[in-house]
C-alpha cells in the first residue's frame, strides 16, 4: 500500500513538473512571438516611413534625402517575417501583409508587376539611353560600336540620349549611323565641353527650349515635334549626377561584399551618404523646375524621358511624375534596374507620359552592357478622345 502511494506521488510530481515545463515553454514561446511581432511592427513602420519619404524635399530634410535607397531592404526583411509567421503562427501573417497593403503605392512604384500586353498598331516606340559617351571610342579599334548597332536594331521612333558627348572622330561615326536612321535631331550642351543630351526623331522638330535651373553640368531640354496633326512635347532630362568617383563606387562595392570592417565601414558609409545627400539637394530644385514646366503645359501631349540620377522612391521621381504616368510602373515588370556600375543596381532612367497616351511593354534592356546604364524603351499609343 505504501509502495503504491509512493508510486502515485512520483507520478503526480512528474505530471506537475511536466505541466510546469509546458507552462514555462509556453511562456517563453509567447514572449518570443511577442518579441518577433514587435520587431515586425517596427519594420513595417520604418518601411512605410521610407516608402513615403519621397514627399520630403531634400533641401529641407537633408538626412532623409536618400532614405529610398534602403527601401528594398525593408521589403525583404518584411517578407522574411511573412515566411516566419507562415511556419510558426499563421495569424501573425496579418502584420507583414497589412504592411504591404499600406505600402502599396511605393511598393508598386519600386517593383511593379503588370500583365504583359503587346503594343497595338499605330503605337510609337520611345527610347531613353544614357550612352556614357558611347562607351569610349578607344575601346573598339575594329570600328564596331555596340551601342550604335543596338540603337540601329531598336528602330525607335523617338530617341533621347544622355551623356552623348563625343570627340570629332566619335561625332563623325555617330553621324554616319544616325543620319541614316533619323531625319530630325538636335543636341544641347550644359556648357562648352559639358554634358550633352540629344534627341533623334522620325517626326519634325518644330521648336526647342531649355528648362532653366541651377546646374554646372546638367540640363533638361523641351522640344515640340509634329506627328500628323498632333504637336507633342518631348522633355529630355539629365539631372544632377551623384558625384561618386571610381573610388567611391569601389568603396560601396567593398561594403556590400563585406570586405570592409569596423571604422573603415563607418567612414566609407558616412562619406557616401554625404555625397549622395549633397547631390540630392542640388537635384531637388532641378526636379521642381521640370515639374513646373510640366504643370505649365497640362492639357498638352507630353512625353518625358531621361536619367534622373535618383531612384523610384525619391523626391525627384515623385515631383516630376505627379502629373504624368510613369510608363515603367504602368506597363513594366520587376525592379528594372537601369544603372549597374560599381555594384550599384538602381532604376534611375525613366519614360513618362501625359494621360492622352497609353504605355505598353516598358522595358529596361539588360542585354547590352557597354554603358554604365541600360536603355529603357516603351511603346505609346494615343488614347481615343472621349
Positions of PLM-derived features:
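Active-site-proximal beta-strand elements of phosphoester/diester hydrolases
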Residues: 123-135, 231-240, 269-272, 276
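N-terminal, active-site-proximal structural segment of metallo-dependent hydrolase catalytic domains
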Residues: 2-176, 189-195, 287-288, 382-386
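Active-site metal-binding loops of divalent metal-dependent hydrolases
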Residues: 129-131, 163-164, 239, 307-308, ...
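Sec-exported extracytoplasmic/periplasmic mature domains
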Residues: 152-156, 179, 205, 295, ...
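Metal-dependent phosphoester-hydrolase catalytic domains
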Residues: 32-47, 52-83, 94-97, 210-211, ...
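A solvent-exposed, charged loop/short amphipathic helix patch at secondary-structure junctions
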Residues: 249-275
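Loop/turn elements at helix/coil->beta-strand transitions in domains of secreted/extracellular proteins
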Residues: 124, 155-157, 230-232, 298-301
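Structured beta-strand-rich core segments of catalytic domains in phosphoester-bond hydrolases
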Residues: 100-121, 138, 148-149, 158-254, ...
Amino acid at each position: 500500500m505504501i509502495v503504491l502511494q509512493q508510486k502515485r506521488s512520483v507520478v503526480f510530481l512528474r505530471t506537475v513538473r511536466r505541466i510546469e515545463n509546458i507552462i514555462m515553454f509556453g511562456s517563453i514561446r509567447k514572449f518570443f512571438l511577442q518579441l518577433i511581432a514587435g520587431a515586425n511592427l517596427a519594420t513595417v513602420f520604418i518601411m512605410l516611413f521610407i516608402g513615403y519619404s519621397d514627399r520630403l524635399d531634400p533641401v529641407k530634410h537633408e538626412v532623409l534625402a536618400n532614405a529610398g535607397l534602403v527601401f528594398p531592404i525593408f521589403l525583404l526583411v518584411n517578407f522574411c517575417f511573412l515566411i516566419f509567421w507562415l511556419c510558426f503562427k499563421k495569424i501573425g501573417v496579418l502584420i507583414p501583409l497589412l504592411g504591404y497593403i499600406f505600402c502599396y503605392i511605393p511598393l508598386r512604384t519600386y517593383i511593379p508587376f503588370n500583365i504583359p500586353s503587346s503594343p497595338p498598331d499605330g503605337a510609337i516606340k520611345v527610347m531613353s539611353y544614357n550612352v556614357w559617351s558611347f562607351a569610349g571610342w578607344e575601346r573598339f579599334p575594329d570600328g564596331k560600336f555596340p551601342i550604335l548597332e543596338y540603337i540601329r536594331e531598336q528602330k525607335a521612333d523617338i530617341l533621347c540620349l544622355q551623356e552623348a558627348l563625343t570627340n570629332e572622330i566619335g561625332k563623325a561615326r555617330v553621324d554616319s549611323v544616325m543620319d541614316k536612321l533619323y531625319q530630325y535631331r538636335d543636341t544641347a550642351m550644359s556648357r562648352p565641353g559639358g554634358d550633352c543630351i540629344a534627341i533623334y526623331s522620325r517626326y519634325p522638330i518644330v521648336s526647342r527650349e531649355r528648362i532653366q535651373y541651377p546646374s554646372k553640368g546638367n540640363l533638361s531640354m523641351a522640344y515640340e515635334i509634329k506627328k500628323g496633326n498632333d504637336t507633342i512635347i518631348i522633355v529630355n532630362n539629365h539631372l544632377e549626377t551623384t558625384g561618386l568617383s571610381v573610388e567611391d563606387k569601389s568603396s560601396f562595392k567593398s561594403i556590400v561584399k563585406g570586405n570592409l570592417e569596423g571604422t573603415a565601414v563607418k567612414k566609407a558609409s558616412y562619406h557616401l551618404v554625404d555625397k549622395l545627400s549633397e547631390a540630392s539637394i542640388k537635384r531637388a530644385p532641378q526636379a521642381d523646375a521640370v515639374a513646373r514646366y510640366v504643370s505649365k503645359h497640362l492639357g498638352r501631349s507630353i512625353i518625358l524621358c531621361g536619367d534622373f540620377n535618383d531612384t523610384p522612391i525619391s523626391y525627384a521621381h515623385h515631383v516630376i511624375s505627379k502629373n504624368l504616368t510613369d510608363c515603367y510602373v504602368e506597363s513594366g515588370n520587376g525592379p528594372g534596374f537601369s544603372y549597374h556600375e560599381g555594384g550599384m543596381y538602381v532604376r534611375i532612367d525613366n519614360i513618362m507620359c501625359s494621360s492622352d497616351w497609353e504605355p505598353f511593354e516598358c522595358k529596361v534592356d539588360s542585354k547590352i552592357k557597354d554603358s554604365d546604364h541600360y536603355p529603357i524603351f516603351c511603346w505609346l499609343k494615343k488614347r481615343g478622345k472621349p
